[in-house]
Amino acid sequence: MLSILSAGIAPALALLSYIYLKDKITEPIWLIIRMFILGALLVLPIMFIQYAISSEFNYDSIFIEAFFQIALLEEFFKWFVFMFVIYQHEEFDNHYDGIVYASSLSLGFASIENILYLITNGIEYAFLRAVFPVSSHALFGIIMGYYLGKAKTHTNYKKKNLTLAFLLPFLLHGIYNFILKGFSSFTLILTPFMVLLWIIALYRLKRANENTIIN
């Protein structure tokens, strides 16, 4: 069990450390841990809602499952928790901060989801899980956090950026799920898609850091 827990949480901690260490102005560790824990606590309620929806409606559509049962619920709840808990917090005062806190939230979610999967299916899937699901949650978190940070620091376009902070991760997550569930040789399509996401995310990291004001 210890090996599964380690394999389940290590990729998320590694990615979060990378994002945190890129920050020009370090955020309080306790607040990052808080967001990570809140992300972890989202997993079981969302799984329950997803199960209830699939049981009640009994649809047979990969598209609906990928975009609405999975991506919509997960990204909306992450976005909502961010807005409720951290958006008005005094420590959220720079563009890059949005990325740090949104990534913490996303990777907390990814860690528990990953541990549950490895418990059910075996530790031999740990590498693939790290490369695809865990890193994808980090990338969606970076994109969400980029626009949340932009909304906080560029108030002229606040509504637009708050909308993009939810809409873009939702659409990208939906595409990711659709590829994963809709194609038998999904790695051939998912790999270039993930590379594209990494390029976008790294660019967003760079831009947000450039916009960070050091007092």
Curated annotation (Swiss-Prot):
Keywords assigned: Cell membrane, Hydrolase, Membrane, Protease, Transmembrane, Transmembrane helix
Enzyme Commission code: 3.4.-.-
Residues in the Extracellular compartment per record: 53-98, 151-178
One GO MF term attached to the UniProt entry: peptidase activity
Subcellular location field: Cell membrane
Topological category with respect to the lipid bilayer: Multi-pass membrane protein
Annotated gene: prsW
A GO CC term assigned to this protein in UniProt: plasma membrane
Chain's role: Involved in the degradation of specific anti-sigma factors. Responsible for Site-1 cleavage of the RsiW anti-sigma factor. This results, after two other proteolytic steps catalyzed by the RasP and ClpXP proteases, in the release of SigW and the transcription activation of the genes under the control of the sigma-W factor.
Any matching Pfam family: PrsW-protease
Alphabetized InterPro entries for the sequence: Peptidase_PrsW_arch/bac, PrsW
Keyword Electron transport in record: no
One GO process term, biological-process aspect: proteolysis
Family per record: Belongs to the protease PrsW family.
PANTHER family per UniProt: PROTEASE PRSW
Cytoplasmic face residues: 24-29, 121-128, 202-215
Transmembrane domains' residue ranges: 1-23, 30-52, 99-120, 129-150, 179-201
Protein name: Protease PrsW
